[in-house]
Design a protein with these regions (language model features):
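Trp/Phe/Arg-rich N-terminal binding region typifying the photolyase-homology
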Residues: 1-188
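Glycine/tryptophan-enriched, flexible segments
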Residues: 8, 156-347
């Protein structure tokens, strides 16, 4: 575009996957900065549904219902910022190349994932787009630590948690990236329609099964998908932690825990936030930052300096990092340090 004096890309696609949020989303922010227009896209891949070779649902109705809510909330957030979410049902390597042709996109911005199937999908998409002259730019945003900040190459990563934890104990956590207040509009070329979010039935699932979730779920609360709900949960979570720490400290000292709440270290308490982390509605760095602000209150809740809620949180997030990095290590021939570019502009907290 000769009139594009700023040297911006004419159009870019942002491929959302397990990063269904606008806060701390480097792929979205980078595309918005680099491009004159952006096309946010989410693909429901039919290969993620149906039955596995063992006869089990690849994606059950409860998880699918939660995912649909996450996608709907992401669409609402993007619309509030002047954009939209293009939704398609089909193989990403087909859907994305067709959209790129329609809008004349020159770049695809995407966060990398860790499993073998997810990486296969990345490679297929990258290959077909390369044939069309579209550059794929990879980012990383699913862990507490960025892989570029680790004190080892991924192929040299310790295979046990103890060794991993020892090596990363002095690694800083990068600051979260603020959610953009305004986004570039959709490309005018191509007249791409947003598309409808599919129903459970259209995904091949039984909707009556998922509706049973309207009764009681684990912990006695309904799980509602989406970034908005995730941030509300995080706020409540931060308020609950000091009380949980105090009760746990009393229990450890032999006193009876007051209030009869869930144990801080129990599965019930942990799962109050993990579903949103799994879908990427909540960034682990955002969770860490928000609870770090409550550090003084957490320490005041217990006299044991090495046993407060923040330390517990870091312990849980470190386990999550370990499993994601170890999965990446053994599920791909590509080295993560080669595939993910460093981002010098992001400082550490």
């Amino acid at each position: 575009n000769p009139g594009n004096a700023a040297g911006l890309r004419q159009a870019s696609i942002v491929w959302f996957r397990n990063d269904l949020r606008v806060h701390d989303n480097e792929a979205l922010v980078s595309a918005n900065r680099d491009s004159s227009s952006i096309l946010p896209v989410y693909c429901f891949d039919p290969r993620d549904y149906g039955k596995s070779s063992s006869g089990f649902d690849k994606t059950g109705p409860y998880r699918a219902k939660f995912l649909l809510e996450c996608v709907a909330n992401l669409r609402a957030s993007l619309r509030e910022r002047g954009s939209d979410l293009i939704v398609r049902v089909g193989n990403p390597e087909d859907m994305l190349v067709n959209l790129a042709k329609s809008v004349g996109a020159s770049g695809l911005y995407v966060h990398q994932e860790v499993t073998h199937e997810e990486q296969e999908s990345e490679e297929k998409v990258s290959a077909v787009l390369k044939d069309e002259g579209v550059e794929t730019k990879y980012f990383w945003g699913s862990t507490l630590f960025h892989p570029d900040d680790l004190p080892f190459k991924l192929h040299e990563m310790p295979s046990n948690y103890g060794g991993f934890r020892e090596k990363v104990q002095n690694v800083h956590v990068r600051k979260t990236i603020e959610a953009p207040r305004q986004l570039k509009g959709l490309p005018q070329q191509g007249g791409v329609k947003p598309g409808d979010i599919p129903s459970l039935q259209e995904l091949g699932l039984n909707p009556t099964t998922a509706l049973r979730q309207d009764s009681q779920t684990a912990g006695g609360a309904m799980l509602v998908g989406g970034e908005g709900e995730a941030l509300k949960r995080l706020q409540r979570f931060a308020l609950e932690v000091p009380g949980q720490v105090a009760n746990q400290a009393k229990a450890f000292s032999g006193s009876k825990s007051e209030g009869g709440g869930d144990s801080l270290y129990g599965a019930n308490f942990s799962c109050k936030i993990s579903p949103w982390l799994a879908m990427g509605c909540l960034s682990p760095r955002r969770m860490f930052e928000d609870l770090k602000k409550d550090g003084p209150r957490l320490k005041a809740a217990t006299t044991a300096n090495d046993d407060n809620g923040l330390n517990w949180l870091v312990f849980e997030l470190l386990w999550r990092d370990f499993f994601r990095f170890i999965t990446k290590k053994y599920s791909s021939g590509k080295k993560i340090h080669e595939a993910v570019p460093a981002t010098a502009s992001l400082a550490a907290v």
